[in-house]
Amino acid sequence: DVAPSRGLGDVYKRQVYNELSQAAMQYMTDNNAVNLKEAGLTNAVSIDAFIKKYFKIVKECGTDGTDCYGKGYKKIDGSTYNPAMQGDTTRSYILANGASISFIPNNIAQIHLDVNGAKGPNIIGRDVFALRLYNNGLIDDYCAQAPCSKEERETRFNTYCTVNSDGTWWGCFGKILNDNWEMTY
């Protein structure tokens, strides 16, 4: 078992990313659709059905994700943050691979991911990331349309990932995509 840490955690991040990507593409294929909205992925109920069909779930946390995540999350600069989303439209799960994941319907889905669940280090940008699932089935950082440009990813990283930014934590995942799955920060 590979412990997620600087460099080695890349295996876990990539595994979950690949599983999400494959599930999105398979969902469109299974529904004979050109994009996720056409396939029916439009709200919390359809996201819940998508997760249950394409992923092995060991725990459902429903609209209160706190039971799916650890305690004491921090950003790289040491500021505190809680990635467990709560709300009527949020759905949180622990997957069989140990990852904690929350889906928030928002122009398809915003995704909060802790690649190793409640286990440490619980640091945004190390084992915890914010991603987006776009209508075209791509998974990327936050931008107008996926795939995000390298410049957009770098801007998000420098603006939000490593600094206290009032609860915004985009950019960490995009930086890893830009840097070929390596944490260079």
PLM regions and their residue ranges:
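Single conserved hydrophobic/aromatic residue that forms the stacking wall/gate
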Residues: 2-8, 12, 20
